[in-house]
């Protein structure tokens, strides 16, 4: 199980422009919130909490076997 700080570090290595995240039951989604859009043109990634594995957002959200449960509201970092 990774911590939020570890997840932020992994995400920033992939794209240092990430400035917001949304927590889900089993993952964190990181993205660019530029005030107009919440993805900054499609730049988003998901990091699984259990494994620390970095996924493209499509792989996480399009997985019909996965139960997507949002935790709280989006947060800027």
Label the model's feature ranges.
Residues 50-76:
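A short, surface-exposed interaction/processing loop segment used at functional sites
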Residues 8, 44, 57-59:
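A generic structural signal for ordered secondary structure
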Residues 1, 76-77:
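Long, contiguous N-terminal structural blocks used for assembly/anchoring
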Residues 5, 9, 47, 70-72:
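N-terminal non-cleavable signal-anchor helices
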Residues 16-50:
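Exposed beta-strand-loop-beta-strand "reactive/processing" segments of non-cytosolic proteins
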Residues 1-17:
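Short, non-transmembrane alpha-helical segments in secretory-pathway proteins
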């Amino acid at each position: 199980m990774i911590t939020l700080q570890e997840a932020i570090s992994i995400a920033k290595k992939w794209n240092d422009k990430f400035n917001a995240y949304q927590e889900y039951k089993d993952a964190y989604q990181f993205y660019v919130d530029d005030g107009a859009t919440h993805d900054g043109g499609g730049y988003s990634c998901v990091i699984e909490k259990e494994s620390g594995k970095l996924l493209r957002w499509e792989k996480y959200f399009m997985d019909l076997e996965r139960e997507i449960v949002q935790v709280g509201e989006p947060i800027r970092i």
